[in-house]
């Protein structure tokens, strides 16, 4: 899961956008 390593690298705005992608439960 290389994307998981890039999560903390990208800005918070992107994290919120990727949140539903990494956590489909929510």
Curated annotation (Swiss-Prot):
EC number: 3.-.-.-
Top class in the EC scheme: hydrolase
Domain of life: Eukaryota
Keyword Plastid listed: no
Keyword Metal-binding listed: yes
Cofactor(s), by name: Ca(2+); Mg(2+)
Keyword line: Calcium, Hydrolase, Magnesium, Metal-binding
GO MF annotations in UniProt: hydrolase activity; metal ion binding
Family: Belongs to the FAH family.
Free-text function comment from the UniProt entry: May have hydrolase activity.
Protein name: Fumarylacetoacetate hydrolase domain-containing protein 2A
């Amino acid at each position: 899961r290389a994307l998981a390593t890039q999560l903390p690298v990208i800005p918070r705005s992107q994290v919120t956008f990727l949140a539903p992608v990494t956590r489909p439960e929510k």
